Amino acid sequence: MYIEETTFIVQELVRKKNLLFPESNNKYVGLIHDSVHRCANVLRNTDALYHNFEHTALVTLCGQDIFVGKKIVDGGVSVEDWIHYTIALLFHDIGYVRNILKEDSGANQVVNIDGDTINVPPTCTDAHLTPYHVERSQLFLRERNWTQNIDLDLICAYVKNTEFPVPKNRLIENIDAKTIEMSRLVTSADLIGQLADPGYYRKIPALYYEFKETGADLRLGYSGPADLKTSYPAFFYNYVRPHISKALKYLNATNNGRSWVSNLNFHVFCEEHRAILSEEGMSLLQTISKKMAEERNFDNALHFILNNICDFQKWPVGHAYCRTKDANEYKMSPTNVWHIHKRTEAIDNFVAV
């Protein structure tokens, strides 16, 4: 499974590079291969319950769809921009793993550029390094040999900005506008890749026990995994959404990107309405969310949604309206999309009108 996952990520990154920059030919293919395998070889040894290679793979794939959207919407990016961005995604959480730095020794783990260390108790997992993993990730990158004119300072700047919660005093000075934006897109990919993961609910217990190991569960007021689930909407609106608006714009530019947005909205909506939705209702929402992510034809998607909602509610007739904004007012206009459970002459006459 490990080999299959690694091979898939390599193939997907090469495919994205060639799609985005067909003139680049085989440039960076070897570096992509080496980077993915280096990342996977380290992360497969972690005993952190959540921050593993699967999480990094999801963040990297989400980041690719964000980058594709940026190129479509704004343009102005190069294959060099892409490779630095992608390496940052691959290695943003590598610092969770113990004994990866030259000065790491047994239980003593380096936590900053000054060489300070902490002792990781034998009963703890790699999650114990959560407060230091961003700094350790940058140190790991700097200890490796890189070729092909890779700008390590740029990659480390991207990784540095994945620190979360985002510090109120975070300042990005003396950096050009593109670097600032790319740095923020790496952060967005980290957040969306986690929260829009189709398997996020299944992984919540793993994330909770990482929090518990560092005491973050108490600081956040969580008494169990269920608290992470119920607090999802508040966490999203208060801490995540302010930092991902640009990335959402780019994701909405492609079908693959919209699937991330759809999953994100689905998770938020479900937790906001869980108290009033039955299990069947939750299943219907998931079905609709999946259809919206896959369907290219809007009318087909609208027919599908209307039919399923009417069947679920046992409504014999349903009609879709289109809301448009005219000046400062919204107007509702009828469409040709109908759901009719059983046709009768009266209903046909009504539809005709």
List where the protein language model places each region:
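Signal-transmission linkers at sensory-effector interfaces
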Residues: 178, 278-300, 311, 332
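Active-site flanking loop/helix segments enriched in acidic
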Residues: 34-61, 119-126
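Divalent metal-dependent phosphate-bond-processing catalytic cores, especially two-metal-ion Mg2+/Mn2+ enzymes
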Residues: 1-15, 19, 65-80, 91-102, ...
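Histidine- and acidic-residue-rich, metal-dependent catalytic cores
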Residues: 63, 127-169
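GAF sensory/regulatory domain recognition
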Residues: 307-310, 319-352
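Short regulatory alpha-helical segment in sensory/regulatory domains of signaling proteins that mediates
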Residues: 48, 289-296, 305-314, 322-324
